[in-house]
C-alpha cells in the first residue's frame, strides 16, 4: 500500500511542492548493512545510523542514493551537478547558495516517518568560517577537498529497527501534472522494492567480521612531531597568560596508507565504536566515515539544541577502574573549567537565534561512555525565533567552540598560526537538511577521510592555562584509537 494516496497528495500539493510517497515492506531478513551494499556502487550515496547511550541502536538507519543534485564548493565557486548530467557554476558564499537551493523546497511532514525523509546530506567544512570572519593567515590546503559537499536526494530507504520494516520513500516534485508525478513515484518505489528482493544479493557478499589477534601494526604518521606539538601547546599557554584567549583546540592529522574496502572500515567502526552519529558518505573519489559523539546543532519542531562535550578519559579495564576514572574526571579542575567555559559559549551561540528567556541548560556535566573513552556532556536548548532558519542556527555555532576555543575568533587565528594545514571537513559539521525543515548535525570528529589510498584521521585537544603538553598530545591519540583500530579490523573481514 502506498501512502499518501493520490487524492491526499492533490490536497497537500496546494501547500507543499515536494511530498514523500512511501511504502512499507518487511525487513526481518535484512540489515542496514545488507541493504546499503546493494546501492554502494552508486557514485554518490550515504548511510546514516545512530547508537543511543553508547549501547542501543536508535530506531532508524537511513540510506540515500541517486541524488538529483550534488553541490560542492571551493572558496567562492560552487559547482551544481544535476542527475541528468548537466552542471553549472555559481559564485558567492556557498552557505547562502545551499540555503537558496533548500529554500525552493517546502516539504510535507508526514506522521510515522523519521526526522529525515529527503533533502540534503553532506558536510560543511571548518574553513567555511572564512566567509564570515576575517582570518587572513590561511594555511596550506593539502587535501584539496570541497569546503562543503552535499547530496540532494529525493529517494530514501529508512530501516526501522523497531518494526523490522523498510520505508521506501520517493519524494514527488510538484511541478506539473500531479497524477503523472504520483504514478512515476509509485513506479520508482516498485523498482527499488524489486532491487531489495533481488536474490543475487543474498549470496553476492557473505563476508563476516572475524577477529584475528595477529594483525599487522599500522604505519601511522602525523603531520606534526611530538616535540613541535608540545611546543605549540606552550605557545598557546603563553597566549592564555597574555589574555588573548581562555582556551584553544590544537589538532594533529594522522595518516595511514590503506587499500582496505572503505565500507568494511565502516562496518568495523560501527562494531568497535558505536556512537550517536554514525555515517558513511561516498562522494565520487573520496569517502567520509565516522562515529562522532558530539551534536553540533539540531533544529526540530521549533527547538534548537547543541550538546558541548569537553573532558575526556580513557575507559577503564574493569568496572571499578572505569568508575574511578569517572570520579577523577569529574573532580579534575582543569577539565571542569574547560567544560563550563564551552557550555557558556554554547549558551551564547544558541541565544543568538533563540527567543529571549528560552535558553536553558539540561543534564549539566553528565558522563557518556564510548568504546575507548568517556566524556563530560551537557545539553543546551532554546526556542528558535520566527525570523531565524535552521541555517542561521547552524552558522551561529559553526565551528563549535569545542573544536576552536574561546573567544572563538581569536582562538581560530591562533589555530591558523600553529597548525600548518587547513582542517578541511575536520571540526566542521556533518548532517542533513530535510525538506520538511528539520536539521541535525554533528561535529566532524572521530572521522576517517579516505582519498587516493590514504586514510586521514584528525584529532585535537583543548589547551587551557594548566595544560600538560605531553598529556594533550596523548589525548589526540586516545581519540584516534578507535578509528585506527577500525582500519586494522577491516582487513579481517573475510
UniProtKB/Swiss-Prot annotation:
Organism of origin: Acetivibrio thermocellus (Hungateiclostridium thermocellum)
Pfam families for the chain: Anth_synt_I_N, Chorismate_bind
Function: Part of a heterotetrameric complex that catalyzes the two-step biosynthesis of anthranilate, an intermediate in the biosynthesis of L-tryptophan. In the first step, the glutamine-binding beta subunit (TrpG) of anthranilate synthase (AS) provides the glutamine amidotransferase activity which generates ammonia as a substrate that, along with chorismate, is used in the second step, catalyzed by the large alpha subunit of AS (TrpE) to produce anthranilate. In the absence of TrpG, TrpE can synthesize anthranilate directly from chorismate and high concentrations of ammonia.
Subunit structure, as described in the record: Heterotetramer consisting of two non-identical subunits: a beta subunit (TrpG) and a large alpha subunit (TrpE).
GO MF: anthranilate synthase activity; metal ion binding
Enzyme Commission numbers on file: 4.1.3.27
Top-rank EC class of the record's enzyme: lyase
Family of the protein in this entry: Belongs to the anthranilate synthase component I family.
Name listed for the protein in its UniProt record: Anthranilate synthase component 1
Amino-acid biosynthesis recorded as keyword: yes
Binding site for L-tryptophan: 50, 276-278
Cofactor(s) named in the record: Mg(2+)
Summary of activators and inhibitors of this protein: Feedback inhibited by tryptophan.
Amino acid at each position: 500500500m502506498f501512502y499518501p494516496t493520490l487524492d491526499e497528495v492533490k490536497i497537500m500539493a496546494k501547500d507543499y511542492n515536494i511530498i514523500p510517497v512511501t511504502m512499507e515492506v518487511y525487513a526481518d531478513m535484512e540489515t542496514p548493512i545488507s541493504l546499503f551494499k546493494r546501492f554502494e556502487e552508486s557514485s554518490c550515496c550515504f548511510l546514516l545510523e545512530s547508537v543511543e547511550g553508547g549501547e542501543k541502536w536508535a530506531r532508524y538507519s537511513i540510506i540515500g542514493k541517486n541524488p538529483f543534485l550534488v553541490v560542492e564548493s571551493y572558496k567562492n565557486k560552487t559547482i551544481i551537478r544535476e542527475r541528468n548530467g548537466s552542471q553549472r557554476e555559481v559564485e558567492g558564499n556557498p552557505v547562502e547558495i545551499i540555503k537558496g537551493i533548500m529554500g525552493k523546497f517546502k516539504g510535507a511532514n508526514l506522521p510515522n516517518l523519521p526526522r529525515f525523509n529527503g533533502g540534503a546530506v553532506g558536510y560543511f567544512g571548518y574553513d567555511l568560517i572564512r566567509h564570515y570572519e576575517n582570518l587572513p593567515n590561511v594555511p596550506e590546503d593539502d587535501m584539496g577537498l570541497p569546503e562543503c559537499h552535499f547530496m540532494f536526494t529525493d529517494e530514501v530507504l529508512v530501516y526501522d529497527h523497531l518494526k523490522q520494516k523498510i520505508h521506501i520513500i520517493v519524494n514527488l516534485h510538484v511541478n506539473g501534472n500531479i497524477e503523472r508525478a504520483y504514478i512515476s513515484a509509485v513506479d520508482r518505489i516498485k523498482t527499488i522494492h524489486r532491487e531489495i528482493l533481488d536474490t543475487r544479493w543474498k549470496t553476492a557478499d557473505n563476508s563476516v567480521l572475524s577477529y584475528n589477534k595477529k594483525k599487522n601494526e599500522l604505519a601511522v604518521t602525523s603531520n606534526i612531531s611530538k616535540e613541535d606539538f608540545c611546543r605549540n601547546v606552550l605557545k598557546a599557554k603563553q597566549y592564555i597568560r597574555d589574555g588573548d584567549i581562555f582556551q584553544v583546540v590544537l589538532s594533529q592529522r594522522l595518516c595511514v596508507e590503506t587499500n582496505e574496502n572503505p565500507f568494511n572500515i565502516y562496518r568495523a567502526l560501527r562494531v568497535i565504536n558505536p556512537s550517536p552519529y554514525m555515517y558513511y558518505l561516498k562522494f565520487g573519489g573520496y569517502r567520509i566515515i565516522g562515529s562522532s559523539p558530539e551534536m553540533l546543532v539540531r533544529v526540530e519542531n521549533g527547538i534548537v539544541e547543541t550538546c558541548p562535550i569537553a573532558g575526556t578519559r580513557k575507559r577503564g579495564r574493569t568496572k571499578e577502574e572505569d568508575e574511578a576514572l569517572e570520579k577523577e574526571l569529574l573532580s579534575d579542575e582543569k577539565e571542569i573549567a574547560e567544560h563550563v567555559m564551552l557550555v557558556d559559549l554554547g549558551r551564547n551561540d544558541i541565544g543568538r537565534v533563540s527567543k529571549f528567556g528560552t535558553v536553558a541548560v539540561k543534564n549539566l556535566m553528565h558522563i557518556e561512555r564510548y568504546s575507548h573513552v568517556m566524556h563530560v556532556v551537557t545539553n543546551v536548548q532554546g526556542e528558535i525565533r520566527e525570523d531565524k532558519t535552521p541555517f542561521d542556527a547552524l552558522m551561529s555555532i559553526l565551528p563549535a567552540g569545542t573544536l576552536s576555543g574561546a573567544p572563538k575568533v581569536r582562538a581560530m587565528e591562533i589555530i591558523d598560526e600553529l597548525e600548518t594545514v587547513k582542517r578541511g571537513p575536520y571540526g566542521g559539521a556533518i548532517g542533513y537538511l530535510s525538506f520538511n525543515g528539520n536539521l541535525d548535525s554533528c561535529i566532524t570528529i572521530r572521522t576517517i577521510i579516505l582519498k587516493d589510498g590514504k586514510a586521514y584521521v584528525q584529532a585535537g585537544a583543548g589547551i587551557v592555562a594548566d595544560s600538560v603538553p605531553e598529556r594533550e598530545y596523548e589525548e589526540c591519540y586516545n581519540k584516534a584509537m578507535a578509528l585506527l583500530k577500525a582500519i586494522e579490523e577491516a582487513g579481517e573481514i573475510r
